[in-house]
Swiss-Prot record:
GO terms for cellular component: large ribosomal subunit. One of its GO terms (biological process) is translation. InterPro entries: Ribosomal_bL32, Ribosomal_bL32_bact, Ribosomal_zn-bd. Belongs to the bacterial ribosomal protein bL32 family. Keywords: Ribonucleoprotein, Ribosomal protein. The keyword Ribonucleoprotein applies. One of its GO terms (molecular function) is structural constituent of ribosome. This is Large ribosomal subunit protein bL32.
Length: 63
């Protein structure tokens, strides 16, 4: 079994663990209503995704 030759320094440990740290999700403002939404998702308030209206797409799929 392999064993480490040197002790890992505190800086190496901290930089390695920094990649696992929790980060707040990045939000953007909706172009239509201005509410904050996560990226690459439809707006929960108005239902738009970029230029397309999500509510119209759902209604067409049901009909």
């Amino acid at each position: 079994m392999a064993a480490p030759k040197r002790r890992t320094s505190k800086m190496k440990q901290r930089t390695r663990l920094a990649a696992q740290a929790w980060r707040a999700p990045k939000l953007r403002k909706c172009q239509n209503c201005g509410s904050s939404t996560p990226g690459h998702t439809a707006c929960p308030n108005c239902g738009t995704y970029t230029t397309r209206s999500g509510k119209e797409i759902v209604v067409k799929a049901e009909a």
